[in-house]
């Protein structure tokens, strides 16, 4: 009995030790757009598949990798860009003016049935256009890659929305747009905290 008591006490002390606490440390994601994202494609993909388990897992995995890579190249927060894609496409359910085959993941140019939005030749280029458009809203520095966003020049003044909250009434007419992005980032943070020890990948 005494041995069992001390064993239990030892295990409890281990679970409360710093190395175990690190496993449960919450990742606080920045709401600033011009900075490096924290999350890996695996984490973004895992979150996405929980929100829409019927999505094409291979496509989600590819998108997550494109977002992390393209955002890193332009100094943009990939966590925000990926979450914005989730909001704009309804986690790739679409259903609005933009259709899946357009490779338009942020509603670029979507105004009406007559102007349903821009079409891009591949997922990679569609993601790049999204990142470039975010860069125009959040930063004043030059692009690192060739311009593929036809609407880039229409963002004036450059750098007017350094955080997600500045996208309300600018990127989107919805005055609650920034709050919706914030709510999605909070969901992502909660997901990471709950699933911090999970290494499951849905794809391979």
Please place each PLM-identified region on the residue numbering.
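Catalytic cores of secreted/periplasmic lytic hydrolases that degrade extracellular macromolecules
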Residues: 2, 15-204
